[in-house]
Amino acid sequence: MTKLKGKDMEKWMKCYVGTNSLRGSKGIYTLEINTQNGEMREASTVEADDSAYLYVSEKRKCLYAVMESLEYKGVPGGGVAAYRIEDNKLSFLNSRYAYGGWPCHVIADEEKDSLLVSVFRNGLLVVYGINQDGSIGEERRVEHHQEPNGRMSHIHASMPTPDGKYIAVADCGLDYIYLYDAKTYQKVFEWKAPEDSGPRQLRFSPDGKYLYMVSELSCQIFVFEYQPDCKDMLRNVQVISTRD
């Protein structure tokens, strides 16, 4: 969501809405919302298949969208697309194959010019480069997770740590949070969540000291102290039930 510039800056706010291609949805909608009276109007629409999760890069003035499908250009799996933000419309730049079905989360590591895509069905974390114009470059790494007992990994979210040293990954299938070295992509830490809790989303606090994890199945918020110089890199300090 971004604020409009000009004389209406205080009144209108721009936002982007991603949708699944069901019940007549066209794709990604650009909306303008009046922050004073709640009025909403559609500014533009770009056709896009199953582009439900979006990420806006303020640095590059680009929007990135996962393509939550099981087929990409005739190949099994989904994709990820890049769009240039131009006033009240989005202009398609390019798209890339996501190496698995149902990619569900995308975020940019702005400092490393990389794009992190979480692929739910196949348990993949795919890292792409970002080109100078904001388009998606070649993949740098494809990381796959699977337990020896046959349980399937379902990566639901990933994000860079505030210090840029690691990538935090939420595995909804195996009930883990992982930390990977952002340069070597080697796993350096793991935290086992309660069985069938379903880690889904991750966010760091503005000061970078805490990580928040939302569990989909147990309806809880887990709070961790992020301490990268300690053996226990993520220390669980609080659990909040959202059912209360």
Residue ranges and their predicted role:
Residues 9-11, 56-60, 109-112, 162-163, ...:
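Residue-level detector of Asp-centered blade-edge/turn motifs that repeat once per structural unit
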Residues 21-24, 69-73, 121-124, 174-175, ...:
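Short glycine/acidic-enriched loop and turn motifs that connect beta-strands
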Residues 24, 50-52, 102-104, 154, ...:
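Beta-rich catalytic cores
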Residues 31-38, 83-89, 128-136, 181-185, ...:
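Short loop/turn segments immediately following beta-strands, especially the blade-tip
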Residues 44-48, 95-99, 143-150, 191-195, ...:
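Surface loop/turn motifs at the tips and blade-to-blade linkers of beta-strand repeat domains
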Residues 91-157:
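Asp-box/WD-like beta-propeller blade repeats and closely related beta-sheet repeat scaffolds
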